[in-house]
C-alpha cells in the first residue's frame, strides 16, 4: 500500500470557534497551532497546508499562571541602535488583547512560507462577537 499524500486542492477545511475566557495562554495556543497545522487529521501531510480555520473569541480574558502577568516580557526593536522596547504580558493584554495569543501561536508554527499561510487562518477577537457567523463555525472546547 502506498503512502498517502494530501493534495492542496483536495483539502477540506472546517471553521472552529474557541472561547478563551479564563483559559491558560499556552494551552490554548498549542491546541490552536495543532489545528492550524492540521495534525489532528488523519490525512496530515507535512508539506501541505491541511489545517482548519480557527476563531478565538474573548482573547482579552486569557490567563497566565504564576506571576507571568508582570514577569513575562515581549521584546521588539526599532532597527536603530539602542532601540529595543520591552512590554509585559499585562500591558500587552491591555493595549492589544489578541497579540499575545497571536505571538504564542506564531512561535509554534513552522518558519517558512507554509507557516505564514497557516497563521493567516487564525482570527483573534478581544470580545465575544466575530464577523464569521456565515461560515457556521463549530464550537471547540479546550
Swiss-Prot record:
Pfam families: Ribosomal_L13. GO terms for biological process: negative regulation of translation; translation. This is Large ribosomal subunit protein uL13. Gene3D superfamilies: Ribosomal protein L13. Belongs to the universal ribosomal protein uL13 family. Disulfide bonds: none annotated. It comes from the Bacteria. GO terms for cellular component: cytosolic large ribosomal subunit. NCBIfam families: rplM_bact. The keyword Ribonucleoprotein applies. This protein is one of the early assembly proteins of the 50S ribosomal subunit, although it is not seen to bind rRNA by itself. It is important during the early stages of 50S assembly. Part of the 50S ribosomal subunit. CDD domains: Ribosomal_L13. Coiled coil: none annotated. The keyword Ribonucleoprotein applies. GO terms for molecular function: mRNA binding; structural constituent of ribosome. Keywords: Ribonucleoprotein, Ribosomal protein. The lineage of its organism: Bacteria, Pseudomonadati, Pseudomonadota, Betaproteobacteria, Burkholderiales.
